[in-house]
Structure formats: structure tokens, C-alpha cells
């Protein structure tokens, strides 16, 4: 049974390993920097526009590393499902890559419909970032880059800046959001 499943899904399993040229340390590091920069830029704009007020809380090096690894595992699990499994299946089943790119981005958005405080804008944002992650896999041939961008995005938003991620606030973050002063803008969605 296991051999049949493994043989049928070998191309999907290979997408996670080092066989694709894009799965390398360079793209992993690029993804981490890009995820931080994308979310950090939005947070900076919201902060400069006075849509959010952040205060420094604390940094505990051991917790920082443990939480980063936890976020990496969680984000990578979503990427494995959407870009590692569904994208790869759709890519092999349809000639047009748009089917795989849009199809798994839709699933990615649907997976987040149960989030606390979900709004039309947040689902649209998640769909669009799903397109971005899919394009990375398509053009860079790198699932690792998608792992890294997703991880850095979530970590930056939730752990570094203390903003809700998927509607969830965590007890440990480097900064804290003054929720009473937060307001919707083009750079930050309070919902």
C-alpha cells in the first residue's frame, strides 16, 4: 500500500527535496528576507500613517528560536498542502499552469475562512499571497522559497510586531499592538 502511494506521488515528494534546482540555501534565504520585507513594509507604512501603535515588549532568545521553528513548521505544513501537493497535482494534470497557480491559491484562501475576524479583504489578501507563493514555485522551482516567505511573513507580523496573524494573537511577541488605537487602512486591516 505505502509503496503504491509513494510511487504515484514521487514527483510531489521530490518537489520538497533538493532535486528541484530552486530548492537551495540561496532561495531559502531570499524567501526569509522577502517575507520580512513585504510584511515589514506594510507594517512600516501603517505605523508611519498612525494606523497602528506598537510598543516594545521583550525579547527572550530561547523563546525567539523556539517560536521561529514552530512558525516554520506551521507555515511549511500549509505550503506542503497547497504548493507541495495540490499545486504539483494540478500542474501535472493540466497543461495550463494558471490552473495550478489559481487553483491552489483558492484552496489556500478557503483554508483561512475560519480565521478569527475574517473579512473579504483578508481573504482577498490571502488569495493574492497564495498566487505569489505559487508563482515562486512556478518560476523559481523552489518550494523552499515559498516555505521561507510564508514563515517570515507570519513571524514578522505575529512575533516581531505583535499583530494578529490569521486572527490569532500570541502570548509571546517582541512588540505589542495597542489594539484600541488600531484602525483599518490600505496598509493594515484591523479585522
Functional labels for PLM-detected ranges:
Residues 12-77, 87-88, 92:
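Juxtamembrane helix-loop-helix connectors linking adjacent transmembrane helices
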Residues 28-33, 64-65, 73-75, 98-103, 123-127, 180-191, ...:
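Hydrophobic alpha-helical transmembrane segments
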Residues 40, 97-113, 127-130:
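Small-polar-interrupted transmembrane alpha-helices in polytopic inner-membrane proteins
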Residues 122-186:
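Functionally important transmembrane alpha-helices
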Residues 77-103, 135-142:
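Membrane-interface helix/loop boundary segments of multi-pass membrane proteins
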Amino acid at each position: 500500500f505505502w509503496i503504491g502511494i509513494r510511487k504515484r506521488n514521487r514527483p510531489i515528494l521530490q518537489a520538497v527535496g533538493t532535486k528541484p534546482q530552486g530548492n537551495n540555501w540561496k532561495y531559502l534565504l531570499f524567501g526569509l528576507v522577502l517575507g520580512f520585507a513585504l510584511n515589514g513594509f506594510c507594517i512600516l507604512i501603517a505605523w508611519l500613517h498612525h494606523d497602528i501603535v506598537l510598543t516594545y515588549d521583550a525579547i527572550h532568545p530561547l523563546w525567539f528560536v523556539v517560536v521561529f521553528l514552530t512558525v516554520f513548521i506551521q507555515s511549511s505544513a500549509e505550503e506542503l498542502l497547497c504548493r507541495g501537493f495540490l499545486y504539483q497535482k494540478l500542474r501535472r494534470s493540466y497543461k495550463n499552469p494558471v490552473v495550478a497557480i489559481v487553483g491552489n491559491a483558492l484552496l489556500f484562501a478557503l483554508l483561512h475562512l475560519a480565521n478569527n475576524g475574517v473579512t473579504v479583504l483578508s481573504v482577498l489578501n490571502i488569495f493574492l499571497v497564495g498566487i505569489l507563493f505559487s508563482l515562486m514555485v512556478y518560476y523559481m522551482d523552489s518550494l523552499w522559497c515559498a516555505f521561507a516567505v510564508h514563515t517570515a511573513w507570519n513571524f514578522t507580523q505575529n512575533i516581531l510586531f505583535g499583530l494578529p496573524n490569521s486572527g490569532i494573537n500570541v502570548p509571546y511577541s517582541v512588540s505589542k499592538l495597542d489594539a484600541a488605537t488600531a484602525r483599518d487602512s490600505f496598509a493594515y486591516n484591523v479585522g
